Amino acid sequence: MRMSFGLTFKRTAKVHWRANFSQQCSLRSTGLFVPPSPPLDPEKVKELQRFITLSKRLLVMTGAGISTESGIPDYRSEKVGLYARTDRRPIQHGDFVRSAPVRQRYWARNFVGWPQFSSRQPNPAHWALSNWERLGKLHWLVTQNVDALHTKAGSQRLTELHGCMHRVLCLDCGEQTPRGVLQERFQVLNPTWSAEAHGLAPDGDVFLTEEEVQSFQVPSCSRCGGPLKPDVVFFGDTVKPDKVDFVHKRVKEADSLLVVGSSLQVYSGYRFILTAREKKLPIVILNIGPTRSDDLASLKLDSRCGELLPLIDPR
């Protein structure tokens, strides 16, 4: 069950936004959104190596913390997460579905942020997990991220728990469209539209003024004329039951669980930690800062994912 079909990663045509956003994003500092962490503890690295060596059916769950080193911020990290830097909050599912103006605002902001968000590339942590899969160490990978970076790194035994921003769905007929194709439709409908944006979010959102949003034209489904929504689980929505059941089965098949870059504050991911605990699986957590499940972990590491994971030999 690979949840990553229908992706294209070509760069889209140039869009009209003012220089300060593109210059800001072009810095691509890998440390911009990564919280400070202590130096690697050699003894803990050895413990993680021992854990991986003994694991025969390892399940890995990743969160936003694995992608901060690729230049995509997370929500909750102290000082550098979206919640710490701004008073903005993610869009709510009910608001998006019910309100055309909310959808217009969302898509205008997403249109501006898309070229930078979609151009982000995997970092050493993504490549390490892909290599673990290739060498037969990884039983399954569950990501809470919507950035497609695991897919770009070549991971195939993958479930995108919250969907993927690289796909768009019609709310009426379910027609699926690659996000890059929709970007071209946006450009055709808004040939002279421009905006000044600030602050990329974990889902590719940026911040615009209401005046900039009001003139933005949003296309409808090319098949039925219905409203379009990214194929992701917005806040206030729930993961589909069949996907939850699928991941529960993968957890029950596993003999160990590694959490990478997640505070586990969201129940959609935390519930699988509870399943692992019920099954008495050893749990290791790699995340800078406290998590909801630190008391359940046999080992907790506060290190950069891209610094630590490549040091581990999966064989």
Curated annotation (Swiss-Prot):
Any Pfam family matching the protein: SIR2
Enzyme Commission designation: 2.3.1.-, 2.4.2.-, 2.3.1.286
Record field: catalytic activity: N(6)-[(R)-lipoyl]-L-lysyl-[protein] + NAD(+) + H2O = 2''-O-lipoyl-ADP-D-ribose + nicotinamide + L-lysyl-[protein]; N(6)-biotinyl-L-lysyl-[protein] + NAD(+) + H2O = 2''-O-biotinyl-ADP-D-ribose + nicotinamide + L-lysyl-[protein]; N(6)-acetyl-L-lysyl-[protein] + NAD(+) + H2O = 2''-O-acetyl-ADP-D-ribose + nicotinamide + L-lysyl-[protein]; L-cysteinyl-[protein] + NAD(+) = S-(ADP-D-ribosyl)-L-cysteinyl-[protein] + nicotinamide + H(+)
Primary subcellular site in the record, as a coarse category: mitochondrion
Chain sites annotated for binding NAD(+): 63-83, 144-147, 261-263, 287-289, 305
The record's free-text note on cofactor binding: Binds 1 zinc ion per subunit.
Protein location: Mitochondrion matrix
Cofactor: Zn(2+)
Span of chain positions assigned to the transit peptide in the UniProt entry: 1-29
Domain Deacetylase sirtuin-type span(s) in chain numbering: 38-315
Cellular compartments per GO CC: mitochondrial matrix; mitochondrion
Listed GO biological process terms: DNA damage response; glutamine metabolic process; negative regulation of fatty acid oxidation; negative regulation of insulin secretion; peptidyl-lysine deacetylation; positive regulation of lipid biosynthetic process; regulation of pyruvate dehydrogenase activity; tricarboxylic acid metabolic process
Misc remark: According to some authors, ADP-ribosyltransferase activity of sirtuins may be an inefficient side reaction of the deacetylase activity and may not be physiologically relevant.
Alphabetized NCBIfam families for the sequence: PRK05333.1 (NF003738)
Sequence similarity: Belongs to the sirtuin family. Class II subfamily.
UniProt protein name: NAD-dependent protein lipoamidase sirtuin-4, mitochondrial
Organism per entry: Bos taurus (Bovine)
Protein encoded by which gene: SIRT4
